Every structure is written in C-alpha cells, then in structure tokens.
C-alpha cells in the first residue's frame, strides 16, 4: 500500500494542474468572448452608420443624376443650336473660301512662275560656281598630291640624314645654336659658336659653344648625338656604347686646361670651367639613362654634366642673370665716371657763361652810353637842321634811340635740409 501513495499523489497533482489549466483557459475564453462581443457591437454600430451614409450618398447621386440629365439636355440643345449656326457659317465660309481659293490659285500660279524662273536662274548660277569650284578643287588635290609626294621624299631624306652619324651631330649643333640665340645672350660677346683652338701637342679642338660668365667663369658646351637616339628601334646596347665613347672622348680632350691656356694667351683671365655634354632632346637624355643607368655618375665623375634642352635653358637663364648683373655693375662704374666728367664739364661751362655774361654787360653798357650821346648831341643837331627847312625825304628819322640796361643779381640758393642731413657717398 505504501508504494501506491506516490502514484496517488502524482495523479492528484496532475488533476489539480488540469483543473487550474481548465480554469485559466475558461477565463481566457470568457475574456476573448467578451472582447469579440464588444467588437461585434462596434462593427454593428459602424454598419448602421455606413448604411445611413449610404442612404445619404444615394440621395446625392439621385440629385446629381437629375442635374446631369438637365445638363445633357442643355448640351443637346446647345449642340443643336451650334450645328445650325455652324451650317449657316459653313455655307457663308464656303462661298467666301471659294472666292479666296480662286484668288489664291491665281496668286500661287504667278508666284510659282516667278519662283521657278528664279530657281532655274539660281540653279544655273550655283551649277556654274560648283563646276568652277570642283575644277579648282581637282587642281588643288592634284597639286596637294604632288606636294605630299615631295614632302614624303623630303621627310625620307631627312630621316635618312638623321639616321647617319653626321646628320645626328648636325641636328644637335643646330638645336644648340637655336637655344643659345633664343636665350637672350649676345653672340660673340656672351657666347661664341664653334670656337677652334690648337693644343700644345698640335691637337685641334673645337667645342660647339663657349659661354663667358662673370668672375672668371667659363661654360664649355659640346653637343653629342647618335643615330640610335633618333632610331625608333631598341638599340640600347649600341646607344650605351656610343655615348660612353663620346663621354670618354670628351674627358680625354681636357677642354678645361686647353681652353684656359688658350684664353690666357689672349689676355683673358678665366679660372673655372664648366663642361656640358648637350643632347638634342629630353627623350635622348631618357634613352641614354635607360640604356646605361650609371651614365650620369660616370659623367659627373669626369666633371661633365649631360643636359637636354630644358636643362640647358635653365642653366642659360642663370648664366644670363649673372651676366646681366655683372654688366649692370660695370655700367654702374661707367655711369659714375661719366657723372664725374659731366660735373667737370658743368664747371667749364659755368666759366664760359660767366665770361659771356661779362661781355654782354660790357656791350650793353657801351651801347647805352652810345645811345645817350647819340640822343643828346647828334639828334639835337638833326632837329635844329629840320627847323631850318631841310627834311629827310621819304625816310622818317627816329625821335631817339632806345636805351637798355642789364640788371645783374646773384642768385640765392635755398638749401632744404633733408631727413638725413649727410649726403650718402656713392661707393665705387
């Protein structure tokens, strides 16, 4: 019996739980039922309101329907009246249009005739111009074709010339000369093209350009080129070999010492020499660096500076600035010397002007004495003779000579003290 007690307790507990669940479920259902009842009541009220609104709208619809029928009847009456008016107007317009059509047809015929004649005339003129222009165009095309063929042959000739070593060298020299001329430097004063000299061992050197810089500085430019620079094919090995040969040749020529020695013989003192290797294009510089990345370091090690047109223009701008500044300094000294000469000339002119003034004073004084004596002695006797009945004929004698006097005075110079009372001396 004891083992049945737990089972009975469990069953009892289950029954109690079921009762509680049923109770809760019933309460929930009652609540939902109450909610649904209230909601149903609300829906019923809404339906009644909607039915009332429906009745009101139906009444309005009936009223609007009556109005529409009245308006339709009015429209029909208006349409009937309009049709009758339109028929009357149509008949009148038809008669008027018939007359206008006749007139317009006559005018149109006349205009068509005139327009056809004018069009035929314009077409004939345009055809003549077109034919002449077409003939001229054919002639121009033929001439242009000949020019293109000649230009093609010329371009081929230039290309072949540039692909030769001599042509490439001439291109670099021409480019260098054009840059120097356009830089603002003075030919044969600030720079010299194709300067030739002979060394002590009878070796002839000819740098392409010498630029004379202030303070005893000298810039030597030697243009170098290779046919591989203008060739579109990839010849990096040949280009590197050629440009390294040019660099070695330029370094072995020792322009610096030989040019300094040659210029010193001509009593031109220069102490420092800058050597530039000029390449005709910036693309040429890039090609050389791409062919031999160590080319610039090799050149700098030999105190040689490879440059293209842009680099050369920058260096020439700086050189022009130095030359202009040096020229301004020299002109400054010349101006001071000229001012000294001018001041000396002013002193000489002042002496001469003083002498001229003294001479003028003496001349006017003597003239005044002469006029006084003439008026007092001579003219009085002339008047006495005229009183005796002797006239001068057609000539009218003056009553007296005018007298002049010179008033001399010393100029007073008013000196105004400036902020800096001591004048600044110009340093020579």
Curated annotation (Swiss-Prot):
Q: Which residues does UniProt call coiled coil?
A: 25-80
Name the Pfam families for this protein.
RmuC
Q: Which family does it belong to?
A: Belongs to the RmuC family.
UniProt keyword annotations, A-Z: Coiled coil, DNA recombination
One record GO biological process: DNA recombination
Q: Which domain of life is it from?
A: Bacteria
* Annotated TM spans: none
Q: What's this protein's name?
A: DNA recombination protein RmuC homolog
* UniProt xrefs under PANTHER family: DNA RECOMBINATION PROTEIN RMUC
Tell me the gene name: rmuC
Its taxonomic path starts at: Bacteria, Pseudomonadati, Pseudomonadota, Alphaproteobacteria, Rickettsiales
Q: Which InterPro entries match?
A: DNA_recombination_RmuC
Task of the protein: Involved in DNA recombination.
């Amino acid at each position: 019996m004891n083992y049945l007690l737990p089972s009975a307790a469990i069953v009892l507990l289950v029954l109690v739980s079921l009762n509680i669940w049923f109770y809760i479920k019933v309460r929930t259902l009652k609540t939902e039922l109450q909610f649904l009842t209230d909601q149903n009541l609300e829906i019923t009220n809404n339906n009644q309101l909607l039915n009332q609104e429906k009745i009101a709208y139906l009444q309005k619809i009936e009223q609007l329907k009556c109005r529409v029928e009245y308006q339709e009847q009015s429209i029909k009456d208006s349409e009937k009246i309009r049709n009758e008016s339109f028929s009357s107007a149509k008949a009148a317009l038809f008669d008027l249009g018939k007359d206008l059509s006749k007139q317009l047809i006559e005018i149109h015929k006349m205009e068509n005739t005139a327009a056809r004649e004018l069009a035929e005339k314009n077409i004939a003129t345009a055809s003549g111009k077109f034919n002449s222009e077409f003939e001229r165009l054919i002639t121009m095309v033929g001439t242009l074709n000949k020019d293109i063929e000649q230009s093609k042959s010329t371009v081929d000739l230039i290309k072949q010339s540039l692909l030769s070593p001599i042509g490439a060298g001439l291109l670099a020299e021409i480019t260098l000369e054009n840059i120097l001329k356009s830089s603002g430097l003075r030919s044969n004063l600030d720079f010299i093209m194709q300067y030739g000299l002979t060394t002590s061992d009878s070796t002839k050197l000819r740098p392409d350009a010498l630029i004379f810089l202030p303070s005893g500085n000298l810039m030597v430019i030697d243009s170098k080129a290779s046919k591989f620079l203008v060739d579109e094919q990839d010849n990096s090995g040949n280009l590197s070999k050629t440009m390294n040969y040019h660099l070695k040749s330029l370094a072995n020529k020792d322009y610096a010492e030989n040019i300094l020695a040659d210029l010193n013989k001509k009593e031109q003192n220069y102490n420092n020499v800058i050597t530039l290797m000029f390449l005709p294009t910036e693309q040429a510089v890039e090609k050389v660096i791409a062919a031999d990345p160590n080319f610039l370091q090799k050149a700098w090690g030999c105190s040689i500076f490879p440059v293209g047109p842009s680099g050369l223009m920058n260096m020439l701008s700086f050189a022009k600035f130095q030359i202009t500044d040096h020229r301004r300094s020299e002109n400054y000294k010349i101006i001071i010397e000229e001012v000294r000469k001018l001041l000396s000339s002013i002193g000489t002119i002042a002496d001469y002007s003083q002498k001229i003034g003294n001479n003028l004073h003496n001349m006017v004084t003597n003239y005044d004495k002469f006029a006084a004596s003439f008026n007092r002695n001579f003219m009085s006797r002339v008047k006495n003779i005229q009183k005796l009945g002797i006239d001068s004929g057609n000539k009218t004698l003056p009553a007296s000579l005018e007298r002049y006097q010179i008033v001399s005075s010393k100029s007073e110079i008013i000196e105004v003290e400036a902020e800096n009372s001591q004048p600044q001396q110009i340093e020579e």
